[in-house]
Design a protein with these regions (language model features):
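Conserved NTP/Mg2+-binding pocket subregion across the NTase superfamily
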Residues: 1-5, 66-157
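Helical scaffold of the NTase/Pol beta-like nucleotidyltransferase catalytic core
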Residues: 1-30
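Short alpha-helical segments and helix-capping/turn motifs at coil-helix boundaries
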Residues: 14-15, 32-35, 82-85
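Short secondary-structure boundary/capping segments within folded domains
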Residues: 19-22, 38-42, 88-89
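Residue-level signal for beta-strand positions within conserved beta-sheet cores that form or flank
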Residues: 25, 44, 95
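Short, conserved beta-strand segments within well-ordered enzyme catalytic domains
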Residues: 28-30, 49-51, 100
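Catalytic metal-binding acidic patch
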Residues: 33-65
Length: 157
């Protein structure tokens, strides 16, 4: 199977936005990393956070997202990291999809690159902006966040 194309990556992202908006427990979807501003290159992966209405619905939402992805895509790798509330998928054409989960009331930006794709509550974008401004205000925290972002990118690619 050949490598994924940028058109395929866009189709997958559009599909995720579509099915996420339909779920009553998914409050917001946030693109993080390079996908929030247009991707680094044609091989960039999809990184996102799904904000849910409450932690009690975490398992149901994770199962829903996984089932929707498996309906349309073929995966050669899947890893669930429960303690980090993270799913990592690798499609058969090598598109990596990383999805984190958390309650929308805990929305916070820990890296500078993020974009709210939809927000049913109208509060996530502001919470992300406020939290990022706090990190930027403390230079050492901002530098730590930048280093963490670089380390994350190098580990995942």
């Amino acid at each position: 199977m050949p490598l994924f194309s940028t058109a395929f990556r866009k189709d997958v992202m559009d599909y995720i936005v579509s099915f996420a908006q339909q779920n009553e427990h998914i409050v917001a979807l946030v693109a993080v990393g390079s996908g929030s501003y247009g991707y680094i290159d044609e091989l960039s992966d999809l990184d996102m956070v799904i904000a849910i209405d409450s932690d009690e619905n975490l398992r149901a939402v994770m199962d829903y997202v996984s089932s929707q992805l498996y309906k349309r895509l073929n995966f050669i790798y899947f890893k669930q990291v429960p303690e980090r509330r993270l799913h990592v998928y690798l499609t058969d054409n090598y598109l990596e999809i990383d999805i984190g989960y958390g309650a929308y009331t805990s929305a916070a930006a820990f890296r500078k690159n993020w974009k709210v794709l939809f927000d049913k509550s109208g509060t996530v974008d502001q919470a992300m902006r406020i939290s990022w401004e706090r990190i930027k205000a403390n230079t050492s925290d901002g530098q730590i966040a930048e280093c963490a972002d670089a380390v994350w990118h190098n580990l995942m690619h």
